[in-house]
Amino acid sequence: MEKMRQQLMEWGKELETFRLPHWEELPDLELYMDQVRTLVDRYLSPVIQGEKHPLLTSSMVNNYVKLGLIPAPVKKRYNKEHVAFLLAITTLKQVLTIPEIKEGILFQGKTVGIREAYNLFCDEQEAAVWMVSQLAQGKSHPQKF
């Protein structure tokens, strides 16, 4: 039990510095599918662990295009808008259904625009992960602000 508690505290400490790239920090160049998948995995692996399957597959991306969750790539290349959508979808699908995610993305996109919606998503995710990190370290009633 003590070893598990120690591992939880170490994981909590690692999560303290977790950050998602905000819109301005996303790559400005066009990427191929494998590069996008690697990037999404790199950004999200600190918070989505223990999966025996990849966080994002080519089939998933193609399905998201077919379902209208993300725009189609241009000449098999993906831009920062695609990466932002895929980071949000991959994170949110851990707790929401695809139809719920689509509804939320469409609503937020229309309300504040894609950039602002994505940056708000990043801020909220970082705050939530920070809270989890504090609880994992045994700190009761953590407050960031």
PLM region spans:
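Basic helix-turn-helix/winged-helix DNA-binding cores
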Residues: E2-Q108
